[in-house]
């Protein structure tokens, strides 16, 4: 497969949380029990799979049940609240290329009465609306890292949520997130850093403020194997182009 599903902020790194919280993670999470989703103390989230029509129907039934429990019901083919207002979401994008991803999603949502409108706008307007948090759904790329730090206070910190043009476009305000980011930035060793990162990832994932999409787990580089040679192993987190320029060599004729 060309792409892999994203699962959490720190997927494909040592900072990624897996399984249930370790004792070190629980020590950081326990003070926030009752203030974060209870699921945080269980297994890490796994994106739902749709291996065919049958699994898609099962997921749609689960979604419909959750919406019904929240007070939404279908009337005249549309999912409506107690006031009779339909659930309409706008997907903001800076170009029309996202339609290939959004259109199938919109069709599936339509089956449970939800209307998803794809709204491509020019980049200037897109940026302006993003800065003012004037959107329902959009796509953002969070840069992968194995050494996260203070930038996460801008991405998910409570103070940043009230500052226009900040990185906290989700608007999350959580004392637990603030404390875990602080713990992460004050870590003096990997043994202190990793539990803080994994605990933060669990809280963000179980808050369901982000819909994980995908990443490419490989670098695609076309080259002449007769003329160029390369090391057998690529170092972790290396950029493909830079690695090729810095370490490949010419084969002898």
What are these regions (language model features)?
Residues 49-53, 90-96:
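Short beta-strand->loop
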Residues 1-46, 61-64, 96-107, 127-253:
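Detector for C-terminal structural segments
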Residues 118-128:
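Short helix-initiation/N-cap motifs at beta->coil->alpha
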Residues 85-94, 116-119:
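Short, well-ordered beta-strand elements
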Residues 60-90:
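Immediate post-signal peptide segment of exported/extracytoplasmic ligand-binding proteins
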Residues 73, 115-117, 136:
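Residue-level detector of anion-binding/catalytic polar loops
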Residues 6-9, 75-81, 117-120, 192, ...:
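Surface-exposed patches in mature extracellular/periplasmic domains of secreted proteins
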Residues 105-116:
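Short alpha-helix C-terminal cap/hinge motif
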